[in-house]
From Swiss-Prot:
This is Probable phosphatase Sbal195_1503. It comes from the Bacteria. GO terms for molecular function: phosphatase activity; zinc ion binding. Zn(2+) 2 binds at residues 16, 41, 195. It comes from Shewanella baltica (strain OS195). GO terms for biological process: bacterial-type flagellum-dependent swarming motility. Zn(2+) 3 binds at residues 74, 102, 132. Pfam families: PHP (PF02811).
């Protein structure tokens, strides 16, 4: 099964990634991906693009050869207050805001601190999706985070890269997150976290967890472009209004 939506990708603008927007579009066409988000690392990361990169994402076309592009960021959660490294009116220019913990910006400490920081990011209203919350380097109170995400309408990511490239040992945590999300009505999304275009839309390991816990497909954001766009619009992203009509006739893939 090929899902048509990928919310988490990195380009050469993050210098530890290896593909361009053109590369991603080419692979998207090959794989049947209809909508993907360009979410390079926030500027607090050492090799992240400059702040202006995100301000200027408006130059990206909405559609190229039938593939839609979301203008976004994977911001860094910086502290226990849940602050991120992108702010103010500039956030309103983005279609999608991901945020997560990254060691160079916010080193791991303890479960209580991680949980408070993540929940504060969720409560801030600035973050749409929490990335790789199953990272074993940052243990959290999974039930508390899932409850908060459900209450504030924020999605939690099951990050496929965590099972294949980085954050090894994430499987048990991600399974627990999926189970808690099912119980508390939390929205989930699978993210490839691609750092090279070849892995765009690669969700096999994440999908296995979704299937294992029998998470409801109706709450999975990858189910269709229109589902993701409706989620983003409901969260106040007026910028996606011009994309919504382009996917009005799509149907869930599962």
């Amino acid at each position: 099964m090929q899902y048509q939506v990928d919310t988490h990708t990195h380009t050469v603008a993050s210098s530890h990634a290896y593909s361009t927007i053109h590369d991603y579009i080419a692979v998207a066409k090959q794989k049947g991906i209809r909508l993907f988000a360009n979410t390079d690392h926030g500027p607090a990361m050492a090799d992240a693009p400059h702040f202006w990169h995100f301000v200027n994402l408006r130059v990206l076309p909405r559609m190229v050869d039938g593939v839609g592009i979301l203008r976004g960021i994977e911001a860094n959660i910086k502290n226990i207050d849940g602050e991120i490294d992108f702010f103010g009116d500039y956030l309103k220019q983005l279609d999608i805001v991901l945020a997560g913990f990254h060691e160079p910006v916010y080193p791991p400490s303890d479960k209580a601190t991680h949980t408070e920081a993540m929940i504060n990011a969720i409560k801030s209203g600035k973050v749409d999706i929490i990335t790789h919350p199953g990272n074993p380097a940052y243990p959290i109170d999974i039930e508390a985070v899932a409850r908060a995400a459900a209450e504030y309408g924020v999605a939690l990511e099951i990050n496929n890269s965590s099972f294949e490239v980085s954050r090894k040992g994430s499987e048990a945590n991600c399974t627990a997150i999926a189970k808690a999300a099912k119980e508390f009505g939390t929205i989930l999304v699978m993210g490839s976290d691609s750092h090279v275009a070849f892995s765009l839309g690669g969700f096999a390991r994440a999908q296995a967890i979704i299937d294992e816990v029998a998470y409801p497909p109706s709450r999975l954001l990858n189910r269709s472009p229109s589902a993701l766009l409706a989620f983003l619009a409901a969260r106040g992203h007026e910028t996606v209004a011009d994309l919504i009509p382009l996917f009005s006739d799509d149907e869930p893939c599962c």
